[in-house]
Amino acid sequence: MRNLVIMPAMAQNRERMNLGEYAEEATIIVDEPVRPAKHFIEANTQEATLHHLKHECITPVFSKDNELTINHAAFVETIQDAAQSFFSGERVEQADIRVSHIIKGRIPEAIHKPANQLLESDKTIYYERAAFSIDVPTIYETVGGNKLNLSIVGVRAYNQMNLYSKKVPELFRLAIGFKNQVCCNMCIFTDGYKDDLRVSNTTELYRAALELFNNYNPAKHLHLMQQLGNTSMSEHQFAQIIGKMRLYQCLPTGYQKALPRMLLTDTQINSVAKAYINDENFGSFGSELNMWKFYNLLTGANKSSYIDSFLDRSLN
């Protein structure tokens, strides 16, 4: 009795059980870090949907004759239609819309309500500035190891118009170029940009968009960008360029007029210098920097521009 050992019933039967028939291959679950979405413009902007612009925002008018402006939603839809028509047979994606500078108001019935008692139905809003990007991903090329998709960008800023007058042709900016898929930087070329597009209705806007698309030469634009990779600068030369860019703003007006315009701000120039050291895609700290990477350092810094100056600086 002293040698008696009581064993669980499961232990006695363990050798007779074929556990393999119930076993499954182990699945290793790895949590992928969520990377923040990259946008073609970032500074002081928020994402907006076309539905929001169409159904939840009011349309500003010219105050002297109460004539409607072409609102942001109509602008986006018109260019979207023009792109789908011109690039028939290609895949044209829906617009990525960014807005800024919200203008708030109230309906007449809520004029005398305290602000803390306002209902959502009492409020009105519209956005002073809007920009959008429409990609055509089936038209693409690789430059410097980066995939570039054809992209159309539109910009509208009510602050650049006089809404206190009678209705006049309205100002729009429209560009077609390529978007770097690594960083969403926009690459704009002179032939693909209209900086002073003035129209009175969406029909004229549609026609102007088709004209811009037709005049743009993507092959020439791509060739010029590919050539950038054939030229490099040393770290010393990069430092000289950054220093001269910083000096530009301090030059007397006469000196500035004798030089090409330089629209980047001091803050953006500082961003270029930081990206030269830290950027995982285009940084070249301690080695030569080719002009394609330098160009992308500049376009990356431009993403911090406000909407109304974004395209001008992209071209510059």
Which residues does each PLM region occupy?
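Feature for intrinsically disordered/low-complexity regulatory segments and propeptides
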Residues: 1-80, 87-91, 98
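Intrinsically disordered, low-complexity regions enriched in serine/threonine
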Residues: 1-35, 113-316
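A generic structural signal for well-ordered alpha-helical segments enriched in polar/charged residues
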Residues: 81, 85, 251-254
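A short acidic/basic microdomain associated with nuclease active sites
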Residues: 85-124, 129-131
